[in-house]
């Protein structure tokens, strides 16, 4: 992100991120505080051990038991105590056929737990290139603890960014990234507008969620105009 900022010649910018991107955006702000003007974040993901366990081992399995069973049963029983490790192993093996089967199961599982939000699930045919790239990136980072020094990296360093104006929207029924993560983050921020969007889930494209995000953008546009006038 910093290389992109430098390439574009931007002094300070507003960062808009969702889901996995919120973790990346928050870490960027922690390291490049002086370059972040404001932030809009949707579906807070802190990438903690608890977050990963909830989605890939237990937690969401109690809400989508049939979908999770398919995700779990692809892995031999002797490896089911650590599904993230088992999928990571298959994603980066030399057997391309096995890799693609594993990625398809992984990807379709994630889509199915968002099914109530009218998410389009690809046919059970060829795996999509976007599914491969996303799965490999996710597994690589999740399995390696995001390459962070500790397992609660963001919250342990959020003090550094507590005075950045941050706008956060999180769906009440977001099962991919839980509301509790947003709540823990917001408790540590001084300049935060936090909206729990009732009836919304993880997708930014539903009517209720997009309405909130558009309002955030309009608010920031007005603030940017005022900043220009005061120069």
Segments predicted by a language model, with ranges:
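A catalytic-pocket lid/entrance helix-loop region that shapes and gates access to the active site
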Residues: 34-86, 212
């Amino acid at each position: 992100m910093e290389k992109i900022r430098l390439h574009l010649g931007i002094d300070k910018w507003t960062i808009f991120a969702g889901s996995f991107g919120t973790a990346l955006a928050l870490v960027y702000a922690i390291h490049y505080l002086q370059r972040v003007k404001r932030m809009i974040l949707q579906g807070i993901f802190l990438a903690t051990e608890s977050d990963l366990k909830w989605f890939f081992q237990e937690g969401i399995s109690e809400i989508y038991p049939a979908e999770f069973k398919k995700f779990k049963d692809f892995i031999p029983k002797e490896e089911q105590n650590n599904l993230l490790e088992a999928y990571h192993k298959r994603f980066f093996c030399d057997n391309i056929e096995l890799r693609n089967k594993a990625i398809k199961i992984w990807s379709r599982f994630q889509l199915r737990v968002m099914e109530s939000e009218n998410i389009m699930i690809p046919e059970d045919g060829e795996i999509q290139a976007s599914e491969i790239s996303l799965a490999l990136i996710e597994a690589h980072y999740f399995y390696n603890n995001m390459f962070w020094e500790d397992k609660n990296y963001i919250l342990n360093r959020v003090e550094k960014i507590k005075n950045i104006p941050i706008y956060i929207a999180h769906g009440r029924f977001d099962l991919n990234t839980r509301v509790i993560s947003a709540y823990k983050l917001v408790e540590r921020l001084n300049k935060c507008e936090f909206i729990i969007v009732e009836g919304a889930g993880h997708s930014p494209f539903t009517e209720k969620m997009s309405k909130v995000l558009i309002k955030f953008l309009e608010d920031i546009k007005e603030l940017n105009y005022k900043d220009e006038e005061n120069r």
